[in-house]
Amino acid sequence: MPRLALTVVFTLLAAGPLQAAEPALPVFTDITEKAGIRFKHSIGDFKLSNIVEGTGAGVLVFDFDNDGWMDLYFVTGRWHPDVSDNYGRQLRGKLSNRLYRNNHDGTFTDVTERAGVGGHQFSCGASAADVNNDGFVDLYVLNYGPNELFLNNGDGTFTEISEKSGLADPRWSLQAVWFDYDGDGLLDVYVVNYLEYDKGVFRAYYAAQNYPGPLSYPGQPDALYRNNGNGTFTDVTKEAGVYNPEGRGMGVTVLDFDNDGLPDIYVTNDAMPNDLFHNTGGGKFKEEGLEREAAFGESGQGVSSMGPTFADVDHDGWLDLYIPDMDYGCLLMNRHDHFEDRTTATGLAVICGQYTGWGGIFLDYDNDGSADLFIANGNAHNEYPEDPVLVRNDGQGRFIDVAAQSGDYFRAKYVARGAAFADLDNDGDLDLIVINLNAAPKVLRNDGGNRNHWLAVRPMTVGGKRDALGARVTVAAGSMVQIMDNCPTRCYLSQGDPRLYFGLGQAKKADRVEVRWPDGTKTVLADVPANRLLTIVQPNK
């Protein structure tokens, strides 16, 4: 019987503490200018006047040059004849998406022109995955108009293959998530499409400071594309069972909500029921949102759901969901065969009810082992700024507002939209990147999160060429057991760090690290030292 080939790579990123009593709470420091980020988001016009402009944009975190440091890709709107007012025409040709390479010293360099990824459309979101299994992560940009797929050439440049690939969806796409839905070893993609915007619809019925909402326009169906393995993709939306012509999708994530080893899809829709597509095997899905009580929150009606995020909030071994919205937000706790709305019971409704939430992120910002929550807020219909939210999980079923203690960033208001998480400086704590509508983004360095111990895990497929999207990682340290599914697409219009970060608190090692691979096989490691990046490559069968 042949031996299993297992590759484990330990990378010591930063020295952790020897001992600490009760660590002070971390703060987030605005390093945007110091980091050399000169990007500014634009709605492609001078005045916010419609739902296309108001939807905003996200940000992508990915390591495009395989140097072990996370790079940033920012997307922007641009003047569009079907969207923008005539006086914004002077912006035509002056706006583009921007790619920033991480210089390893806290700064970034704009390499957009050399890379060839400025794009040509009104962009809303971006995602990344190694679509051809060549070891280099590729770039997919979601647009109002044809989407754009850029293949990574491995030399710092990209080649656009949008039309040839079959992924140049002409509809209004907001977000995409990559995963292997059929288990063939190739990454497929689910694309969220929003609505059919018409510049002239109902304009006379709205006050000057407002504009028509999502129900004023027909919805558009999302799309699931199967990777054919030859550089092309096939639309399998209907045959896979994920067709919803009136969803008005705003966000998507992939998680194994029922612990059966298969990737399920959760889609958030605007003013409509959310969709929970249960993977029943054989490349088929069944919509079970209402049946599992995940279609609505406790209000029992569709709200303006934005980007979903997930984590095992209560350490019961089942992944929970949070959905920012225009109401109180919605925390759906996984009760194994259904979900329960615990937004009010956990204290989140009181904290979040006064804001319009867009980019929600579960992250353990203080590395104590429990999932905390950041929410980027901003008015939906005008450029009225709102407070960002940061709440700390107390480990006892409540969330505590800690924004006032978390740095100067939280003392100001913003018209925020997308957001992403990343360990940009490889120091063991998660930083934040927040996109502001028609303004500069904020890059926020986490200072102090690594006072507690931590472990970062990056599961890779056989051969170590690409991230094992869909793998589940379990980390046990002392009495605490944490789980996380490998899906970095878990925030509004954005994609975060592909590495999975686990806070260990005062534990100096993980007693057990388990990777359940997408094919169901498992790799188990014991007594893993803390404060390092652990790259685990799936063994050959």
PLM segments and residue spans:
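Hydrophobic beta-strand segments that make up the repeating blades of beta-propeller
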Residues: 69-76, 134-143, 189-193, 260, ...
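Repeat-based blade/solenoid architectures
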Residues: 37-58, 93, 115-127, 166-177, ...
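Beta-propeller blade termini
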Residues: 56-66, 101, 122-137, 148-151, ...
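Bacterial N-terminal signal peptides
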Residues: 5-16
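Beta-propeller blade signature
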Residues: 95-102, 220-227, 278, 388-394
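Gly/Ser/Thr/Pro-enriched helix-cap/hinge segments flanking short amphipathic alpha-helices
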Residues: 21-27, 45-46, 338, 346, ...
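Short, conserved, GDST-rich strand-edge loop motifs in beta-rich repeat architectures
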Residues: 75-92, 193-217, 374-384
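Blade-edge beta-strand/turn elements of extracellular beta-propeller
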Residues: 28-31, 107-116, 157-167, 231-243, ...
